[in-house]
Structures are given as structure tokens and as C-alpha cells.
């Protein structure tokens, strides 16, 4: 009976059995709640990591402001990489072949200034003509200045009196048989010192005495004969033309 009683030991009866059944249900409920909490925790961590990554990107775009400063700039969009190269159209190739150049923006729209070789030639021709005219004008001005300086130098040399001019006047006076004029010039300049006033009076006076020691022994008749000849006059005219070309 004892063995049968042990084998057939009845379980808890009544409230104790109900409590054990209730304890099993509570354990399963607690385990489900724990699993739910773990799932929500994983979702929260993933969301926080996503937000942290986004904030880091925004911070790289906005910059790194120091604490206490307000952000006053707008975020900029990251540049998009262009994977496809722009292929020029037929019109653009024709413009490039014709010598037209242009500038293009990011959208491929060309804003070009058309400058060909013909335009360059047209612009260079007036510039070269202007430079040539300036050079010619400067050369003409320089030549005029040099001519004026030469004329002034010659004029200053002619206007100045020198002993050579006196000698020329004396020679011309002799050739034109102006003996008195010659004597006056000699007396005025006193360049030779040979003929004096007394000697000239002695030589040219009406009365010529034997006691007159005249160093310039001249015959007035020879002078008169010289004045009458045409050869002497021609020589005088040639001398005048050489000495006084004006």
C-alpha cells in the first residue's frame, strides 16, 4: 500500500494547484515583456545611431560652430558628380573649325565672343598706320628743329663782326677804286699800321713833295685806269657775289 501510495502521490489540490498554474502564466508573460523591451531598445539604438550620423553630416555642412554661437548660414547642397561627358553638337564643331571661340557654363550653354583672324587683321592695320604717322610727324619735327638751329647758327656767324670782314671791305673798296673809303677804313681799324694819315695825305694830296716818305707808293692814274676797264668791274662783281651772296 505504501508503494502504491507513493506512486499515486497526488499533486497539489485546490488553491495550491491554481497558484502553480498561475505562476507558469506569469513567467511566460514576464519573458514576453522582456523580449519586447529588448526589441524596442534595439530599435531605439538604431534610430539614435542614424540620427547621430545625420547630425555629423549636417555639422560638416554647417561647419563647427563654437559653443554659444548661433548658426547663421544656410546648409549647402553637396555637388553632384557628372558621370556623363558632354558631347559637342554639330554646330559647335562647325564654330570651332571656323575659328570662333566661346565660353561654356555648367549647363553647356555657350556665351562666346566671336573673334576671327580677319577681325584681328582689321584691328592691326589702323594701329600700324597710326604708329607710322606718329613716327613720320616726330621725324619731321626733329628735322625742322635741326634746320632752324643750323640757320640760327649761320645767321649768328654772319651778323657778328670780325677782322676778316674788315679785310673784305678793304679789298672791295680797292677793287671799286674807292681809295678814300679804303683810307678811312684803314685809319678807323688801324689794322696794318703802315699807312698813317700823313702818308695818305702825302700820297693822295694835290701837292706831292719830295720830302714825303710815303710807304704806300700808289699811282692814282692806275686807279682811274682800273676803274675804266670792264675786266676789273667783272672781277669786282664776282667778288661781291662770293662775299655777299644775298
Swiss-Prot record:
The lineage of its organism: Eukaryota, Metazoa, Chordata, Craniata, Vertebrata. Residues 44-63 have a biased composition (Polar residues). Residues 74-246 form the MDFI domain. It holds the Pfam family MDFI. The cysteine-rich C-terminus is involved in its granular distribution in the cytoplasm. The cysteine-rich C-terminus mediates protein-protein interactions, including interaction with HIV-1 Tat, transcription factors, AXIN1, CCNT1. Residues 33-43 have a biased composition (Basic and acidic residues). It comes from the Eukaryota. Required to control the activity of various transcription factors through their sequestration in the cytoplasm. Retains nuclear Zic proteins ZIC1, ZIC2 and ZIC3 in the cytoplasm and inhibits their transcriptional activation. Modulates the expression from cellular promoters. Binds to the axin complex, resulting in an increase in the level of free beta-catenin. Affects axin regulation of the WNT and JNK signaling pathways. Involved in the development of lymphatic vessel valves. Residues 1-71 are annotated as: Disordered. Expressed in lymphatic tissues. Detected in the spleen, thymus, peripheral blood leukocytes as well as prostate, uterus and small intestine. Expressed in lymphatic endothelial cells. Belongs to the MDFI family. One of its GO terms (molecular function) is cyclin binding. It comes from Homo sapiens. The gene is MDFIC. This is MyoD family inhibitor domain-containing protein. GO terms for biological process: negative regulation of DNA-templated transcription; negative regulation of protein import into nucleus; positive regulation of DNA-templated transcription; positive regulation of viral transcription; regulation of JNK cascade; regulation of Wnt signaling pathway.
Amino acid at each position: 500500500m505504501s508503494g502504491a501510495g507513493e506512486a499515486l502521490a497526488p499533486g497539489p489540490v485546490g488553491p495550491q494547484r491554481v497558484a502553480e498554474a498561475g505562476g507558469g502564466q506569469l513567467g511566460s508573460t514576464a519573458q514576453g515583456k522582456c523580449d519586447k523591451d529588448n526589441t524596442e531598445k534595439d530599435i531605439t539604438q538604431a534610430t539614435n545611431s542614424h540620427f547621430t550620423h545625420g547630425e555629423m553630416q549636417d555639422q560638416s555642412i554647417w561647419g563647427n560652430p563654437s559653443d554659444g554661437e548661433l548658426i547663421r548660414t544656410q546648409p549647402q547642397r553637396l555637388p553632384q558628380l557628372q558621370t556623363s561627358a558632354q558631347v559637342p553638337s554639330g554646330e559647335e564643331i562647325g564654330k570651332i573649325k571656323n575659328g570662333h571661340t566661346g565660353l561654356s557654363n555648367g549647363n553647356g550653354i555657350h556665351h562666346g565672343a566671336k573673334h576671327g583672324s580677319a577681325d584681328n587683321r582689321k584691328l592691326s592695320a589702323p594701329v600700324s598706320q597710326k604708329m607710322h604717322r606718329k613716327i613720320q610727324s616726330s621725324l619731321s619735327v626733329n628735322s625742322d628743329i635741326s634746320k632752324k638751329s643750323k640757320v640760327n647758327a649761320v645767321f649768328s656767324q654772319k651778323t657778328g663782326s670780325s677782322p676778316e670782314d674788315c679785310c673784305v671791305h678793304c679789298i672791295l673798296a680797292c677793287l671799286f677804286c674807292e681809295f678814300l673809303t679804303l683810307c678811312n677804313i684803314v685809319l678807323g681799324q688801324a689794322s696794318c699800321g703802315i699807312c698813317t694819315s700823313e702818308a695818305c695825305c702825302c700820297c693822295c694830296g694835290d701837292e706831292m713833295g719830295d720830302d714825303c716818305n710815303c710807304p704806300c707808293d700808289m699811282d692814282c692814274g692806275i686807279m682811274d685806269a682800273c676803274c675804266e676797264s670792264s675786266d676789273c668791274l667783272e672781277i669786282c662783281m664776282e667778288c661781291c657775289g662770293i662775299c655777299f651772296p644775298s
